[in-house]
């Protein structure tokens, strides 16, 4: 025992000395030491991981951009950019080459097969080619009756619960019911019953926990602490496994259907694709995750921002009610005429981006030119949506909701609209872009056609109270919906 204590002390001191030496090296001598950033972020990845788990990392990154400029160091081996040109430099293709994804971030579960978001370039190309069938114009036309039926049911449920404007309705909850229902149907024909039963399907209810776990694991993996964090949150991971098991059962039912359907995974079931059941499940999870909660967040954010800005609300209501004489005229095709509503959605993407963080890539060993600067090899790089969308050098009055900036308004002539890319750019941009715009415009057009809306608590700081874990942890948005009398 007398020999053990000195050995323990010496070992502890050696470990502390190593950690301090490593932190000093990271701050002053690392290849990225020339790039500015707060010292604790530059010294250790634990700082970034802490704020990601705390849900305020997007604010910290924005603060550093305000302090240091358009490129900042947010971890020992990671940079954030708010250059407009960095979109193509990071996510585009140059001479047939593109920066690889930072797979420690995207592969949060090593047991999960690669999917459309996490796959390498070659695998992604194959998956996207076969999934493209489900997102084609013909497929969307074939699926339009399904979407219209569910949107009509959403409006019916809102009308029932609104009680002629006398009862408070949480539109965030109902938008989530609808978007999960729609993406479940479109992806693999699942009938989740959220709207029909007026309550969460147990599997959908588990998605909130799933998104939180994915956010935690992405943060941990990005700084090499995946196994430790996985052990610490093991009780939270158990519901995720149940979520995946139930999803696998639903996918199994769909793969047993021999009749061809126009849903998204039909292209993955072709004999020449040869995907395992696990790979199909992984892709279904990715598609549902990308097309459900983020779409509901966009809808809720747009409605909240409009109700907080009466002039803009009046314009979008006038556009909807002057364009359509009957509800049957409001279709996926006809809503494309709603230019002001499209501007509102684009402004919401900027003002309240559903995904706040960066989608990280990694530079090759020889380095890469990004934003006109040489970035050393093996550096994680990304554009953080919250930072670039609120950069006063790119947007006039960035914390003000003004859809007019997307309609050539002279007062916003200095805005750099090319800085907004909510669906990313390049060969790996979001495959569901057109569906997202069509679905959200359809729901909002029906909503403003049927109802006059009023916030239940006009003083609620709905936007300011939220944390972000890959997507926003959005609270209830309660309002009164009074049916329009015609």
UniProtKB/Swiss-Prot annotation:
Q: Which residues are glycosylated?
A: 346, 434
Q: Keyword Signal, does the record have it?
A: yes
Signal sequence interval, chain numbering = 1-21
Q: Name one Pfam family in it.
A: p450
User: EC number(s) per UniProt?
Assistant: 1.-.-.-
Which controlled-vocabulary keywords does the entry list?
Glycoprotein, Heme, Iron, Metal-binding, Monooxygenase, Oxidoreductase, Signal
- Group of enzyme by EC: oxidoreductase
What is its cofactor? Answer: heme
Q: Check the record and name the InterPro entries matching this protein.
A: Cyt_P450, Cyt_P450_CS, Cyt_P450_E_grp-I, Cyt_P450_sf, Cytochrome_P450_monoxygenase
- Where does this protein act, in terms of pathway? Mycotoxin biosynthesis
Q: Where does heme bind?
A: 430
Single Gene Ontology MF annotation: heme binding
Role noted for this protein = Cytochrome P450 monooxygenase; part of the gene cluster that mediates the biosynthesis of aphidicolin, a specific inhibitor of eukaryotic DNA synthesis and DNA polymerase alpha. The geranylgeranyl pyrophosphate synthase GGS is required for supplying a sufficient amount of geranylgeranyl diphosphate (GGDP), the general precursor of diterpenes. The diterpene synthase ACS then catalyzes the conversion of geranylgeranyl diphosphate to aphidicolan-16-beta-ol via the intermediate syn-copalyldiphosphate (syn-CDP).
What the entry lists under PANTHER family is as follows: CYTOCHROME P450, P450, PUTATIVE (EUROFUNG)-RELATED
Q: Which family does it belong to?
A: Belongs to the cytochrome P450 family.
What name is this protein filed under? Cytochrome P450 monooxygenase 1
**Upper taxonomic classification of the species?**
Eukaryota, Fungi, Dikarya, Ascomycota, Pezizomycotina
Q: Which gene encodes it?
A: PbP450-1
């Amino acid at each position: 025992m007398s020999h053990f204590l000195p050995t323990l002390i010496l070992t502890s001191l050696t470990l502390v000395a190593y950690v301090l030496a490593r932190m000093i090296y990271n701050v002053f001598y690392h290849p990225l030491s020339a790039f500015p950033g707060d010292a604790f972020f530059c010294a250790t990845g634990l700082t970034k991981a802490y704020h990601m788990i705390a849900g305020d990392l997007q604010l910290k990154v924005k603060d550093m951009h305000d302090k240091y400029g358009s490129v900042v160091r947010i971890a020992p081996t990671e940079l954030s950019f708010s250059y407009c040109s960095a979109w193509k430099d990071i996510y585009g293709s140059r001479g047939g080459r593109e920066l690889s994804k930072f797979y420690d971030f995207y592969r949060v579960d090593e047991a999960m097969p690669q999917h459309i978001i996490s796959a390498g370039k070659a695998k992604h190309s194959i998956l996207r080619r076969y999934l493209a069938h489900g997102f084609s114009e013909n497929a969307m036309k074939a699926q339009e009756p399904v979407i219209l039926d569910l949107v009509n049911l959403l409006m019916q449920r809102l009308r029932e619960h609104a009680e002629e404007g006398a009862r408070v309705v949480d539109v965030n909850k109902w938008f989530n019911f609808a978007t999960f229902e729609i993406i479940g149907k479109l992806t693999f024909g699942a009938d989740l019953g959220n709207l029909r039963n007026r309550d969460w399907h147990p599997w959908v209810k588990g998605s909130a926990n799933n998104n939180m776990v994915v956010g935690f694991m992405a943060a941990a993996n990005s700084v090499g602490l995946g196994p430790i964090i996985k052990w610490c949150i093991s009780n939270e991971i158990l519901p995720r496994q149940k979520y995946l098991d139930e999803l696998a059962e639903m996918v199994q039912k769909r793969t047993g259907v021999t009749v061809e359907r126009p849903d998204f995974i039909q292209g993955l079931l072709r004999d020449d694709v040869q995907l395992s059941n696990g790979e199909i499940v992984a892709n279904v999870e990715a598609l549902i995750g990308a097309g459900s909660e983020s779409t509901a967040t966009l809808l809720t954010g747009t409605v909240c921002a409009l109700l907080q800005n009466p002039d803009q609300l009046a314009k979008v209501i006038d556009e909807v009610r002057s364009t359509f004489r009957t509800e049957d005229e409001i279709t996926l095709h006809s809503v494309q005429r709603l230019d002001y509503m499209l501007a509102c959605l684009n402004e919401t993407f900027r003002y309240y981006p559903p995904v706040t963080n960066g989608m990280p890539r990694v530079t090759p060993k020889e380095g890469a030119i990004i934003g006109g600067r040489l970035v050393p090899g093996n550096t994680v790089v990304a554009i953080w949506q919250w930072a670039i969308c609120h950069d006063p050098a790119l947007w006039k009055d960035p914390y003000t909701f003004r859809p007019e900036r997307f309609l050539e308004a002279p007062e916003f002539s200095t805005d750099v609209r090319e800085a907004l890319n909510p669906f990313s750019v390049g060969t790996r941009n979001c495959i569901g872009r057109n569906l997202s715009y069509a679905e959200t415009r359809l729901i909002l057009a029906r909503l403003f056609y049927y109802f006059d809306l009023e916030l239940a608590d006009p003083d609620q700081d709905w936007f300011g109270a939220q944390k972000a874990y890959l997507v926003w942890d959005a609270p209830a948005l309660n309002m009164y919906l009074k049916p329009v009398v015609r």
